[in-house]
């Protein structure tokens, strides 16, 4: 197959633009939270797998953390197990936790591993229970109204938060040229399982590894101002101002807090990426314009 002159010129431009970024990130670790539309479209799934394999091929170390909420919901429905949510979190009783483990640790995790491996990678699937990769504890949720003298504690079952990450295991896999693919299930002090928000797991893994980047794939173009324009580069201070003035609100707040915590915890930058764009991960790290919002501790020049 031959390229015409214009196509060949475009390929050369793309490679030329990518080269300084490749040099900058060789040997660095990037943690990518994979979810949303990027997990549902066959074209986007294939593009994501190729992106991950290419990153590894040029010397970058990707670590993938995935979600799977819709798939969990589908199986619960088929099993006639009712789903309840409190503050956006799935109430996870024992029966629901069994389904979460089956779907995240089994079906979804192995599908992603298989896809990456089919495109030339060496992915290995993990849950937080493997070698106690993600130690967790029960998440305490409270609610208080003006009439209450003390906050009400709400039991949402086997929902957890990260206590620690086994970085020795992840570093061993990365050095062995494997691509870790992590399901967000944590293990408690007594061996119990916890369902943990995938964004939070990705953020804590990035902090623990002192990753170069935390990349959160979403179903939006990035953080937007009140006029609907994408904000391509922000400092943590600017993000806090946008939260204070109500520009960032609702369902985006937990995701943004995770991105902020990661940067403040030692990650060089966090990225809110439009996962609906083919090859979004490569476009964000290897091009000048990117496809989302970059958050750092310092201003861009």
Curated annotation (Swiss-Prot):
Reaction(s) the record says it catalyses: N-acetyl-L-glutamate + ATP = N-acetyl-L-glutamyl 5-phosphate + ADP
Principal localisation: cytoplasm
EC nos: 2.7.2.8
Root EC class: transferase
Domain of life: Bacteria
GO biological process assignments: arginine biosynthetic process via ornithine; L-arginine biosynthetic process
Gene: argB
Binding site for substrate: 68-69, 90, 195
UniProt name for this protein: Acetylglutamate kinase
Annotated positions for site Transition state stabilizer: 33, 255
Pathway connected to this protein: Amino-acid biosynthesis; L-arginine biosynthesis; N(2)-acetyl-L-ornithine from L-glutamate: step 2/4
A Pfam family recorded for this sequence: AA_kinase
Residue ranges crossing the lipid bilayer per the database entry: none
Subcellular location: Cytoplasm
One term under GO cellular component: cytoplasm
Family according to the record: Belongs to the acetylglutamate kinase family. ArgB subfamily.
Alphabetical list of InterPro entries matching this protein: AceGlu_kinase-like_sf, AcgluKinase_fam, ArgB, Asp/Glu/Uridylate_kinase, Glu/AcGlu_kinase, NAGK-C
A GO MF label: acetylglutamate kinase activity
Keyword annotations of the record: Amino-acid biosynthesis, Arginine biosynthesis, ATP-binding, Cytoplasm, Kinase, Nucleotide-binding, Transferase
Physiological role: Catalyzes the ATP-dependent phosphorylation of N-acetyl-L-glutamate.
Organism whose genome encodes this protein: Pseudomonas entomophila (strain L48)
């Amino acid at each position: 197959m031959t390229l015409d002159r214009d196509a060949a010129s475009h390929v050369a431009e793309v490679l030329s633009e990518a080269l300084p970024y490749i040099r900058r990130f060789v040997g660095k670790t990037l943690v990518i939270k994979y979810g949303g539309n990027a997990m549902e479209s066959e074209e986007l799934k294939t593009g994501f797998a190729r992106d991950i394999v290419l990153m590894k091929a040029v010397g970058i170390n990707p670590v993938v953390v995935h979600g799977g909420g819709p798939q969990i919901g589908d199986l619960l429905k088929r099993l006639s197990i009712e789903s309840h949510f409190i503050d956006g979190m799935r109430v996870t009783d024992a029966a629901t936790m069994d389904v979460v483990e089956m779907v995240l640790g089994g079906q979804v995790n192995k599908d992603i591993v298989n896809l990456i491996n089919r495109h030339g990678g060496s992915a290995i699937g993990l849950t937080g229970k493997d070698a106690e990769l993600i130690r967790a504890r029960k998440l305490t949720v409270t609610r208080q109204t003006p009439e209450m003298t003390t906050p009400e504690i709400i039991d949402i079952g086997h929902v957890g938060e990260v206590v620690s990450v086994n970085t020795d295991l992840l570093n061993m896999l990365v050095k062995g040229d494997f691509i870790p693919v992590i399901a967000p299930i944590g293990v408690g002090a007594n061996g119990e399982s916890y369902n943990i928000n995938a964004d939070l797991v990705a953020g804590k893994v990035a902090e623990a590894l002192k990753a170069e980047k935390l990349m959160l794939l979403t179903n939006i173009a990035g953080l937007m101002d009140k006029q609907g324009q994408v904000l391509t580069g922000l400092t943590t201070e600017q993000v806090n101002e946008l939260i204070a003035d109500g520009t960032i609100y609702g369902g985006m707040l937990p995701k943004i807090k995770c991105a902020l915590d990661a940067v403040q915890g030692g990650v060089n930058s966090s990225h809110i990426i439009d996962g609906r764009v083919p090859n979004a991960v490569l476009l964000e790290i290897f091009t000048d314009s990117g496809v989302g919002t970059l958050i750092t501790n310092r201003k861009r020049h």
